[in-house]
Amino acid sequence: MARIAGVDLPRGKQIVIALTYIYGVGKTTAQKVLKNAGVPENVRQDDLTPEQEDKIRAALDSVKVEGDLRREVNLNIKRLMEIGSYRGIRHRRGLPVRGQNTKNNARTRKGKKASMAGKKK
């Protein structure tokens, strides 16, 4: 089982799909990384040679993935909250950030319904 960017890639899958298990790597990024590394997309993860693994690791070094990407996203959200922007306020209050309606929906973001004492149907 190959370990790339701190992630154990699943056995038996094509390498282009296995790379998508890394946070920050989708199918398009995986294809670009494999093209830069000179590794065919249809090769299975089990069939990778150590040289191919090293080439993939080297090509992935130029892409922000895993911890670095998570840290950057969290810092961006913290920055929005600190400067008091509309988006930052929505993050702070736990409400949808991108303009969704909150009158009826948004249960995922708002959490479980709070029951109101004394309210009749």
UniProtKB/Swiss-Prot annotation:
The keyword Ribosomal protein applies. Residues 106-121 have a biased composition (Basic residues). The keyword rRNA-binding applies. One of its GO terms (molecular function) is structural constituent of ribosome. One of its GO terms (biological process) is translation. Keywords: Ribonucleoprotein, Ribosomal protein, RNA-binding, rRNA-binding, tRNA-binding. SUPFAM superfamilies: S13-like H2TH domain. Residues 91-121 are annotated as: Disordered. GO terms for cellular component: cytosol; small ribosomal subunit. Belongs to the universal ribosomal protein uS13 family. Located at the top of the head of the 30S subunit, it contacts several helices of the 16S rRNA. In the 70S ribosome it contacts the 23S rRNA (bridge B1a) and protein L5 of the 50S subunit (bridge B1b), connecting the 2 subunits; these bridges are implicated in subunit movement. Contacts the tRNAs in the A and P-sites. Part of the 30S ribosomal subunit. Forms a loose heterodimer with protein S19. Forms two bridges to the 50S subunit in the 70S ribosome. This is Small ribosomal subunit protein uS13. It comes from Lacticaseibacillus paracasei (strain ATCC 334 / BCRC 17002 / CCUG 31169 / CIP 107868 / KCTC 3260 / NRRL B-441). The gene is rpsM.
